[in-house]
Protein backbone atom coordinates (compact mmCIF):
# COMPACT_ATOMS: atom_id res chain seq x y z
CA UNK A 1 0.00 0.00 0.00
CA UNK A 2 1.12 3.58 -0.67
CA UNK A 3 2.95 5.26 2.19
CA UNK A 4 2.03 8.73 3.45
CA UNK A 5 5.63 9.68 2.69
CA UNK A 6 5.80 7.66 -0.56
CA UNK A 7 5.72 10.40 -3.22
CA UNK A 8 9.45 10.17 -3.90
CA UNK A 9 9.48 6.36 -4.20
CA UNK A 10 8.71 4.11 -7.17
CA UNK A 11 8.59 0.89 -5.16
CA UNK A 12 6.86 -0.01 -1.93
CA UNK A 13 8.77 -1.93 0.76
CA UNK A 14 8.36 -5.67 1.16
CA UNK A 15 6.08 -6.70 4.01
CA UNK A 16 8.99 -8.01 6.08
CA UNK A 17 10.76 -4.66 5.71
CA UNK A 18 7.62 -2.91 6.95
CA UNK A 19 7.44 -5.24 9.93
CA UNK A 20 11.12 -4.80 10.76
CA UNK A 21 10.94 -1.03 10.56
CA UNK A 22 7.59 -0.56 12.28
CA UNK A 23 7.43 0.70 15.86
CA UNK A 24 3.66 0.71 16.32
CA UNK A 25 3.80 -2.49 18.37
CA UNK A 26 5.37 -0.49 21.20
CA UNK A 27 5.03 3.23 20.49
CA UNK A 28 1.25 2.88 20.63
CA UNK A 29 1.94 3.45 24.34
CA UNK A 30 2.28 7.11 23.32
CA UNK A 31 -1.20 7.35 21.78
CA UNK A 32 -2.63 9.78 24.35
CA UNK A 33 0.50 11.93 24.29
CA UNK A 34 0.49 11.96 20.48
CA UNK A 35 -3.12 13.12 20.29
CA UNK A 36 -2.62 15.64 23.10
CA UNK A 37 0.38 17.11 21.27
CA UNK A 38 -1.62 17.28 18.04
CA UNK A 39 -4.46 19.13 19.76
CA UNK A 40 -2.00 21.77 20.96
CA UNK A 41 -0.34 21.95 17.53
CA UNK A 42 -3.70 22.48 15.82
CA UNK A 43 -4.65 25.21 18.28
CA UNK A 44 -1.33 26.93 17.62
CA UNK A 45 -1.82 26.69 13.83
CA UNK A 46 -5.20 28.40 14.23
CA UNK A 47 -3.72 31.15 16.42
CA UNK A 48 -1.07 31.81 13.79
CA UNK A 49 -3.61 31.92 10.94
CA UNK A 50 -2.35 28.74 9.30
CA UNK A 51 -5.64 26.91 9.97
CA UNK A 52 -9.03 28.57 9.88
CA UNK A 53 -11.27 28.38 12.92
CA UNK A 54 -13.52 25.92 11.10
CA UNK A 55 -10.57 23.72 10.07
CA UNK A 56 -9.14 23.67 13.58
CA UNK A 57 -12.58 22.90 15.01
CA UNK A 58 -13.03 19.91 12.73
CA UNK A 59 -9.51 18.64 13.45
CA UNK A 60 -10.02 19.13 17.19
CA UNK A 61 -13.31 17.23 17.12
CA UNK A 62 -11.72 14.40 15.15
CA UNK A 63 -8.77 14.17 17.53
CA UNK A 64 -11.04 14.21 20.57
CA UNK A 65 -13.01 11.33 19.06
CA UNK A 66 -9.77 9.38 18.62
CA UNK A 67 -8.69 10.25 22.16
CA UNK A 68 -11.95 8.91 23.54
CA UNK A 69 -11.49 5.69 21.55
CA UNK A 70 -7.92 5.45 22.86
CA UNK A 71 -9.17 5.74 26.43
CA UNK A 72 -11.76 3.05 25.70
CA UNK A 73 -9.07 0.85 24.11
CA UNK A 74 -10.93 0.53 20.80
CA UNK A 75 -8.34 1.98 18.40
CA UNK A 76 -6.84 -0.55 15.99
CA UNK A 77 -3.26 0.01 14.86
CA UNK A 78 -1.50 -1.37 11.79
CA UNK A 79 2.16 -1.96 10.94
CA UNK A 80 1.29 -0.71 7.45
CA UNK A 81 1.42 2.77 8.96
CA UNK A 82 4.70 2.20 10.79
CA UNK A 83 4.31 4.24 13.95
CA UNK A 84 1.86 5.95 16.26
CA UNK A 85 2.06 9.25 14.33
CA UNK A 86 1.10 7.88 10.92
CA UNK A 87 -1.51 5.59 12.44
CA UNK A 88 -3.22 8.53 14.14
CA UNK A 89 -2.93 10.70 11.01
CA UNK A 90 -4.51 7.94 8.92
CA UNK A 91 -7.34 7.52 11.46
CA UNK A 92 -7.90 11.29 11.55
CA UNK A 93 -8.17 11.43 7.75
CA UNK A 94 -10.66 8.57 7.87
CA UNK A 95 -12.60 10.46 10.56
CA UNK A 96 -12.76 13.96 8.99
CA UNK A 97 -11.48 13.55 5.42
CA UNK A 98 -8.44 15.09 3.62
CA UNK A 99 -8.48 18.03 6.04
CA UNK A 100 -6.75 15.71 8.51
CA UNK A 101 -3.64 15.96 6.34
CA UNK A 102 -3.34 19.66 7.17
CA UNK A 103 -2.54 18.89 10.81
CA UNK A 104 1.07 18.04 9.97
CA UNK A 105 1.75 21.55 8.64
CA UNK A 106 4.88 23.01 10.24
CA UNK A 107 5.68 19.78 12.02
CA UNK A 108 7.81 16.65 11.51
CA UNK A 109 7.57 13.25 13.08
CA UNK A 110 10.98 14.07 14.55
CA UNK A 111 9.74 16.88 16.80
CA UNK A 112 6.41 15.08 17.22
CA UNK A 113 7.92 11.94 18.76
CA UNK A 114 10.27 13.94 20.96
CA UNK A 115 7.26 15.90 22.23
CA UNK A 116 5.37 12.68 22.90
CA UNK A 117 8.21 11.31 25.01
CA UNK A 118 8.61 14.53 26.96
CA UNK A 119 4.88 14.44 27.74
CA UNK A 120 5.05 10.75 28.65
CA UNK A 121 7.91 11.23 31.11
CA UNK A 122 6.36 14.38 32.57
CA UNK A 123 3.35 12.32 33.57
CA UNK A 124 5.16 9.20 34.74
CA UNK A 125 8.00 10.89 36.62
CA UNK A 126 5.39 12.90 38.53
CA UNK A 127 3.67 9.61 39.37
CA UNK A 128 6.95 7.97 40.42
CA UNK A 129 7.63 10.85 42.81
CA UNK A 130 4.21 10.25 44.41
CA UNK A 131 4.97 6.52 44.70
CA UNK A 132 8.33 7.25 46.35
CA UNK A 133 6.55 9.46 48.89
CA UNK A 134 4.05 6.69 49.63
CA UNK A 135 6.91 4.24 50.19
CA UNK A 136 8.67 6.75 52.44
CA UNK A 137 5.52 7.08 54.54
CA UNK A 138 5.39 3.29 54.92
CA UNK A 139 9.01 3.31 56.13
CA UNK A 140 8.25 6.10 58.61
CA UNK A 141 5.23 4.25 59.99
CA UNK A 142 7.23 1.05 60.47
CA UNK A 143 10.15 2.99 61.96
CA UNK A 144 7.90 4.78 64.46
CA UNK A 145 6.76 1.41 65.79
CA UNK A 146 10.36 0.18 66.14
CA UNK A 147 12.45 3.00 67.61
CA UNK A 148 13.56 0.81 70.54
CA UNK A 149 13.59 -2.43 68.58
CA UNK A 150 17.24 -3.48 68.59
CA UNK A 151 18.99 -5.71 66.08
CA UNK A 152 22.59 -6.30 65.07
CA UNK A 153 24.02 -3.80 62.63
CA UNK A 154 26.34 -5.37 60.06
CA UNK A 155 29.51 -4.64 58.15
CA UNK A 156 30.81 -7.26 55.71
CA UNK A 157 27.58 -9.13 56.64
CA UNK A 158 29.21 -9.78 60.02
CA UNK A 159 27.58 -8.53 63.22
CA UNK A 160 29.17 -5.21 64.06
CA UNK A 161 27.24 -3.03 66.52
CA UNK A 162 23.68 -3.07 67.88
CA UNK A 163 21.38 -0.49 66.28
CA UNK A 164 17.76 0.62 66.33
CA UNK A 165 15.64 -1.04 63.65
CA UNK A 166 14.03 2.36 63.04
CA UNK A 167 17.50 3.76 62.34
CA UNK A 168 18.04 1.03 59.76
CA UNK A 169 14.72 1.71 58.03
CA UNK A 170 15.31 5.46 58.01
CA UNK A 171 18.59 4.92 56.16
CA UNK A 172 16.45 3.88 53.20
CA UNK A 173 14.11 6.81 53.74
CA UNK A 174 16.99 9.22 53.14
CA UNK A 175 18.24 7.27 50.13
CA UNK A 176 14.75 7.55 48.67
CA UNK A 177 14.69 11.26 49.50
CA UNK A 178 17.76 11.77 47.31
CA UNK A 179 16.17 9.63 44.59
CA UNK A 180 13.09 11.82 44.75
CA UNK A 181 15.21 14.97 44.46
CA UNK A 182 16.99 13.54 41.43
CA UNK A 183 13.66 12.96 39.70
CA UNK A 184 12.46 16.44 40.63
CA UNK A 185 15.64 17.89 39.19
CA UNK A 186 15.28 15.77 36.04
CA UNK A 187 11.84 17.32 35.52
CA UNK A 188 13.62 20.59 34.67
CA UNK A 189 15.01 18.91 31.54
CA UNK A 190 11.88 16.87 30.84
CA UNK A 191 9.62 19.92 31.02
CA UNK A 192 10.96 21.48 27.79
CA UNK A 193 9.04 21.46 24.50
CA UNK A 194 10.65 20.34 21.22
CA UNK A 195 7.38 20.86 19.30
CA UNK A 196 7.96 23.07 16.28
CA UNK A 197 11.62 22.15 15.81
CA UNK A 198 10.57 20.40 12.60
CA UNK A 199 12.72 17.70 11.08
CA UNK A 200 15.91 19.46 12.19
CA UNK A 201 15.94 23.09 10.98
CA UNK A 202 12.62 24.54 12.11
CA UNK A 203 9.94 25.60 9.60
CA UNK A 204 9.13 28.41 7.18
CA UNK A 205 5.59 28.67 8.58
CA UNK A 206 4.98 31.50 11.08
CA UNK A 207 4.37 29.23 14.06
CA UNK A 208 4.41 30.13 17.75
CA UNK A 209 6.35 27.46 19.62
CA UNK A 210 5.92 29.16 22.97
CA UNK A 211 2.14 29.05 22.61
CA UNK A 212 2.01 25.29 21.93
CA UNK A 213 4.47 24.74 24.79
CA UNK A 214 2.21 26.72 27.11
CA UNK A 215 -0.84 24.70 26.05
CA UNK A 216 1.03 21.47 26.85
CA UNK A 217 2.21 22.72 30.24
CA UNK A 218 5.90 22.95 29.36
CA UNK A 219 8.08 25.49 31.14
CA UNK A 220 10.12 26.43 28.08
CA UNK A 221 11.13 25.43 24.56
CA UNK A 222 14.33 23.97 23.13
CA UNK A 223 16.50 26.86 21.97
CA UNK A 224 18.09 24.85 19.15
CA UNK A 225 16.05 22.79 16.70
CA UNK A 226 18.86 20.28 16.08
CA UNK A 227 19.17 19.69 19.81
CA UNK A 228 15.41 19.43 20.27
CA UNK A 229 14.89 16.59 17.80
CA UNK A 230 18.11 14.63 18.22
CA UNK A 231 19.05 14.35 21.89
CA UNK A 232 17.60 11.92 24.38
CA UNK A 233 19.52 13.06 27.43
CA UNK A 234 16.23 13.67 29.24
CA UNK A 235 15.42 9.97 28.89
CA UNK A 236 18.94 8.97 29.92
CA UNK A 237 18.65 11.15 33.00
CA UNK A 238 15.38 9.43 33.87
CA UNK A 239 16.96 6.00 33.31
CA UNK A 240 19.98 6.96 35.42
CA UNK A 241 17.80 8.15 38.29
CA UNK A 242 15.71 5.01 37.96
CA UNK A 243 18.84 2.85 38.09
CA UNK A 244 19.92 4.46 41.36
CA UNK A 245 16.43 4.12 42.80
CA UNK A 246 16.28 0.44 41.83
CA UNK A 247 19.76 -0.09 43.30
CA UNK A 248 18.43 1.17 46.64
CA UNK A 249 15.35 -1.04 46.35
CA UNK A 250 17.57 -3.99 45.46
CA UNK A 251 19.73 -3.49 48.56
CA UNK A 252 16.66 -3.46 50.79
CA UNK A 253 15.31 -6.48 48.89
CA UNK A 254 18.50 -8.37 49.69
CA UNK A 255 18.08 -7.57 53.38
CA UNK A 256 14.41 -8.57 53.33
CA UNK A 257 15.41 -11.89 51.75
CA UNK A 258 18.03 -12.49 54.45
CA UNK A 259 15.85 -11.32 57.33
CA UNK A 260 12.95 -13.63 56.52
CA UNK A 261 15.20 -16.70 56.15
CA UNK A 262 15.27 -19.32 58.91
CA UNK A 263 18.86 -18.32 59.61
CA UNK A 264 17.71 -14.83 60.66
CA UNK A 265 13.93 -14.88 61.25
CA UNK A 266 14.00 -11.14 61.95
CA UNK A 267 10.82 -10.54 59.94
CA UNK A 268 7.97 -12.44 58.35
CA UNK A 269 6.46 -11.35 55.06
CA UNK A 270 2.73 -11.27 54.55
CA UNK A 271 1.50 -14.17 52.42
CA UNK A 272 0.55 -11.68 49.69
CA UNK A 273 4.22 -11.04 48.95
CA UNK A 274 5.49 -14.63 49.08
CA UNK A 275 4.96 -17.83 47.12
CA UNK A 276 5.35 -21.55 47.74
CA UNK A 277 7.12 -24.43 46.07
CA UNK A 278 5.59 -26.94 43.67
CA UNK A 279 7.57 -29.72 45.39
CA UNK A 280 8.41 -28.61 48.94
CA UNK A 281 5.24 -28.00 51.00
CA UNK A 282 6.98 -26.05 53.77
CA UNK A 283 8.42 -23.29 51.58
CA UNK A 284 7.50 -19.61 51.83
CA UNK A 285 9.67 -17.83 49.30
CA UNK A 286 10.22 -14.03 49.24
CA UNK A 287 9.56 -13.88 45.51
CA UNK A 288 8.54 -10.22 45.28
CA UNK A 289 11.77 -9.08 46.94
CA UNK A 290 13.76 -11.42 44.69
CA UNK A 291 12.00 -10.11 41.58
CA UNK A 292 12.72 -6.50 42.51
CA UNK A 293 16.36 -7.45 43.06
CA UNK A 294 16.40 -9.16 39.65
CA UNK A 295 14.55 -6.41 37.79
CA UNK A 296 17.18 -3.93 38.94
CA UNK A 297 19.57 -5.47 36.42
CA UNK A 298 16.89 -5.06 33.77
CA UNK A 299 16.68 -1.31 34.44
CA UNK A 300 20.49 -1.06 34.30
CA UNK A 301 20.28 -2.74 30.90
CA UNK A 302 17.69 -0.24 29.65
CA UNK A 303 19.99 2.62 30.62
CA UNK A 304 23.13 1.13 29.08
CA UNK A 305 21.20 0.19 25.94
CA UNK A 306 20.23 3.80 25.26
CA UNK A 307 23.69 5.11 26.15
CA UNK A 308 25.10 2.69 23.58
CA UNK A 309 22.56 3.75 20.94
CA UNK A 310 23.29 7.45 21.45
CA UNK A 311 27.08 7.38 21.58
CA UNK A 312 27.68 7.33 17.80
CA UNK A 313 24.79 9.34 16.38
CA UNK A 314 25.60 12.43 14.29
CA UNK A 315 23.11 15.31 14.31
CA UNK A 316 20.24 15.24 13.84
CA UNK A 317 17.62 12.47 13.80
CA UNK A 318 18.62 8.90 12.95
CA UNK A 319 16.41 5.82 12.74
CA UNK A 320 18.44 4.33 15.61
CA UNK A 321 16.35 6.59 17.85
CA UNK A 322 13.37 4.34 17.23
CA UNK A 323 15.07 2.10 19.79
CA UNK A 324 14.85 4.74 22.53
CA UNK A 325 11.31 3.88 23.63
CA UNK A 326 11.06 0.26 24.72
CA UNK A 327 13.65 0.66 27.47
CA UNK A 328 11.88 3.81 28.66
CA UNK A 329 8.49 2.05 28.76
CA UNK A 330 10.03 -0.98 30.46
CA UNK A 331 11.76 1.09 33.13
CA UNK A 332 8.63 3.10 33.89
CA UNK A 333 6.62 -0.10 34.34
CA UNK A 334 9.34 -1.73 36.43
CA UNK A 335 9.93 1.25 38.73
CA UNK A 336 6.25 1.96 39.30
CA UNK A 337 5.51 -1.70 40.00
CA UNK A 338 8.50 -2.13 42.31
CA UNK A 339 7.56 0.89 44.42
CA UNK A 340 3.95 -0.22 44.74
CA UNK A 341 4.96 -3.76 45.71
CA UNK A 342 7.57 -2.60 48.22
CA UNK A 343 5.21 -0.17 49.92
CA UNK A 344 2.74 -2.96 50.64
CA UNK A 345 5.51 -5.36 51.63
CA UNK A 346 6.84 -2.96 54.28
CA UNK A 347 3.37 -2.03 55.54
CA UNK A 348 2.37 -5.66 56.13
CA UNK A 349 5.61 -7.33 57.25
CA UNK A 350 5.78 -8.64 60.81
CA UNK A 351 8.82 -7.61 62.87
CA UNK A 352 10.08 -10.31 65.25
CA UNK A 353 11.40 -7.94 67.91
CA UNK A 354 12.39 -10.61 70.44
CA UNK A 355 14.44 -12.54 67.90
CA UNK A 356 16.22 -9.36 66.81
CA UNK A 357 17.01 -8.47 70.42
CA UNK A 358 18.21 -11.98 71.22
CA UNK A 359 20.57 -11.82 68.25
CA UNK A 360 22.34 -8.84 69.84
CA UNK A 361 22.99 -10.88 72.99
CA UNK A 362 24.56 -13.81 71.19
CA UNK A 363 27.43 -12.06 69.50
CA UNK A 364 30.28 -9.65 70.13
CA UNK A 365 28.64 -6.55 68.66
CA UNK A 366 29.05 -4.88 72.07
CA UNK A 367 32.85 -5.10 71.87
CA UNK A 368 33.13 -1.51 70.64
CA UNK A 369 31.28 -0.36 73.76
CA UNK A 370 33.97 -2.06 75.83
CA UNK A 371 36.79 -0.34 73.95
CA UNK A 372 35.03 3.03 74.22
CA UNK A 373 34.57 2.41 77.97
CA UNK A 374 38.31 2.03 78.46
CA UNK A 375 39.10 4.99 76.20
CA UNK A 376 36.80 7.23 78.23
CA UNK A 377 38.79 6.24 81.33
CA UNK A 378 42.02 7.47 79.75
CA UNK A 379 43.41 4.43 77.92
CA UNK A 380 44.50 5.20 74.33
CA UNK A 381 41.88 3.79 71.99
CA UNK A 382 44.38 1.60 70.12
CA UNK A 383 45.45 0.01 73.40
CA UNK A 384 41.81 -0.42 74.42
CA UNK A 385 41.14 -2.05 71.04
CA UNK A 386 43.94 -4.55 71.73
CA UNK A 387 42.69 -5.34 75.26
CA UNK A 388 39.13 -5.97 74.10
CA UNK A 389 40.30 -8.01 71.11
CA UNK A 390 42.09 -10.37 73.50
CA UNK A 391 38.98 -10.60 75.70
CA UNK A 392 36.90 -11.52 72.64
CA UNK A 393 39.42 -14.23 71.71
CA UNK A 394 39.28 -15.60 75.25
CA UNK A 395 35.47 -15.73 75.08
CA UNK A 396 35.54 -17.54 71.75
CA UNK A 397 37.89 -20.18 73.20
CA UNK A 398 35.54 -20.68 76.17
CA UNK A 399 32.34 -20.60 74.11
CA UNK A 400 30.90 -17.62 76.01
CA UNK A 401 30.09 -13.95 75.32
CA UNK A 402 31.51 -10.79 76.92
CA UNK A 403 28.50 -10.36 79.18
CA UNK A 404 29.11 -13.90 80.52
CA UNK A 405 32.66 -13.18 81.71
CA UNK A 406 33.37 -13.01 85.43
CA UNK A 407 34.32 -9.56 86.71
CA UNK A 408 37.70 -10.89 87.85
CA UNK A 409 38.56 -11.70 84.24
CA UNK A 410 37.87 -8.11 83.24
CA UNK A 411 40.13 -6.87 86.03
CA UNK A 412 42.92 -9.17 84.87
CA UNK A 413 42.71 -7.48 81.48
CA UNK A 414 42.68 -3.93 82.92
CA UNK A 415 42.31 -2.32 86.33
CA UNK A 416 40.15 0.37 84.70
CA UNK A 417 37.15 -1.94 84.58
CA UNK A 418 34.47 -1.42 87.20
CA UNK A 419 31.27 -3.33 87.90
CA UNK A 420 29.23 -0.95 85.72
CA UNK A 421 30.79 -2.77 82.77
CA UNK A 422 27.80 -5.13 82.60
CA UNK A 423 25.46 -2.16 82.09
CA UNK A 424 27.73 -0.89 79.34
CA UNK A 425 27.58 -4.28 77.63
CA UNK A 426 23.77 -4.30 77.55
CA UNK A 427 22.70 -3.79 73.88
CA UNK A 428 19.84 -1.45 74.79
CA UNK A 429 22.23 0.73 76.79
CA UNK A 430 24.76 0.63 73.96
CA UNK A 431 22.23 1.94 71.45
CA UNK A 432 20.76 4.51 73.82
CA UNK A 433 24.15 6.12 74.48
CA UNK A 434 25.01 6.75 70.82
CA UNK A 435 23.98 10.39 70.80
CA UNK A 436 26.03 11.84 67.93
CA UNK A 437 24.03 13.58 65.20
CA UNK A 438 22.65 11.06 62.72
CA UNK A 439 23.46 8.14 65.02
CA UNK A 440 21.35 5.26 66.22
CA UNK A 441 20.62 6.59 69.73
CA UNK A 442 16.91 6.54 70.48
CA UNK A 443 16.76 10.31 70.96
CA UNK A 444 18.58 10.85 67.67
CA UNK A 445 16.21 8.47 65.90
CA UNK A 446 13.20 10.35 67.28
CA UNK A 447 14.69 13.59 65.94
CA UNK A 448 15.34 11.92 62.59
CA UNK A 449 11.69 10.84 62.46
CA UNK A 450 10.59 14.44 62.95
CA UNK A 451 12.78 15.52 60.02
CA UNK A 452 11.62 12.60 57.88
CA UNK A 453 7.98 13.44 58.54
CA UNK A 454 8.59 17.04 57.53
CA UNK A 455 10.16 15.87 54.25
CA UNK A 456 7.23 13.50 53.65
CA UNK A 457 4.65 16.15 54.47
CA UNK A 458 3.27 14.25 57.44
Swiss-Prot record:
Family assignment from sequence similarity: Belongs to the lyase 1 family. Argininosuccinate lyase subfamily.
SUPFAM superfamilies in alphabetical order: L-aspartase-like (SSF48557)
Signal peptide: none
Reactions mediated catalytically: 2-(N(omega)-L-arginino)succinate = fumarate + L-arginine
GO biological processes: arginine biosynthetic process via ornithine; L-arginine biosynthetic process
Pfam families: ASL_C2 (PF14698), Lyase_1 (PF00206)
UniProt superkingdom: Bacteria
UniProt-listed NCBIfam families: argH
Subcellular location as annotated: Cytoplasm
A GO molecular-function descriptor: argininosuccinate lyase activity
Main subcellular location: cytoplasm
Protein name per the record: Argininosuccinate lyase
Pathway assigned in UniProt: Amino-acid biosynthesis; L-arginine biosynthesis; L-arginine from L-ornithine and carbamoyl phosphate: step 3/3
HAMAP family the record matches: Arg_succ_lyase
Keyword tags: Amino-acid biosynthesis, Arginine biosynthesis, Cytoplasm, Lyase
Organism: Bacillus velezensis (strain DSM 23117 / BGSC 10A6 / LMG 26770 / FZB42)
GO annotation, cellular component aspect: cytosol
Protein's UniProt keywords contain Coiled coil: no
CDD domains (alphabetical): Argininosuccinate_lyase
The enzyme's E.C. designation: 4.3.2.1
Amino acid sequence: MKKLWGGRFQKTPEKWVDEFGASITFDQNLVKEDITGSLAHAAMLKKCGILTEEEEGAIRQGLQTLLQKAEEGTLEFSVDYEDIHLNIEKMLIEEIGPLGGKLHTGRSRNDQVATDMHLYLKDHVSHIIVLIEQFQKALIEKAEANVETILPGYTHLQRAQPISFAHHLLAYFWMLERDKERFRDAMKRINISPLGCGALAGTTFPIDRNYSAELLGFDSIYENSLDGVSDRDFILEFLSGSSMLMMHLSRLSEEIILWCSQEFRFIELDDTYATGSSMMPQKKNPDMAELIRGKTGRVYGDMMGLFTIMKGLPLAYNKDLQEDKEGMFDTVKTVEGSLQIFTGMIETMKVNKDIMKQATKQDFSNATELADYLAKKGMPFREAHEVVGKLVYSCIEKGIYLSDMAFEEFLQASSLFEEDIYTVLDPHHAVEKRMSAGGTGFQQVEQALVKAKACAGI
